[in-house]
Amino acid sequence: MVTFYLWRMSAAAIISNWKKKEFKPVYWLEGDEDYFIDEIVEYAEKKILSASEAEFNQTIFYGKDANWTDIVNACRRYPMFAERQVVLLKEAQQMKDVEKLESYIENPLPSTILVVSYKGKTLDGRLKFSKTIKKKGEVFLSKKMYESQLPGWVNEYLQSNGFQIKPKALHLLIEHIGNDLSRIVNEIDKLSINIGSEKNITEDHIEKFIGISKEYNILNCKML
């Protein structure tokens, strides 16, 4: 099994555990692939709590503007009319003193779920801060996918949404977009709307709805 699927399963495993109401007090999401981090954060924001629970028990901070004391104070609050609360720290890589959260992470409140998004960077595993997070919570490393792994991932994503894609169309899509997973998903989602009830994606669909010229496609095919 290639490394990519291990990464993907790690993201899926976190969400799967949440669906089973199995939570750790801290989740640290880091690395240079935004897609999987965003996937986890979106679930945490929209699915862990019901709408009525989130009204009183969900707090969102953004690293650029966040003060570590405010985050700690929010984490130390007890939930209202719910079993737990969710505290999200997005774009934590923009927070200058994020390591000061260690004082809370060393002794987290069991009823609080702190989810930290630390995009484009990774912590130095030798630091005490990093070791504390690993001891008290869970660290998810999201890496950029290798080019050789993209076809399998795109096929898996399409099949999970009820679509098939012809090999040349798949190559054309990846060649044009590259390994930006968020953009690939956005283009596929847009494509699925435009092709209506059709379930087999062809080169014509890619050319028409993703904006790839026929000249580019002809040149690309000659290079195969």
Predicted features by range, described:
Residues 2-224:
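Conserved beta/loop motifs at nucleotide-recognition and modification sites
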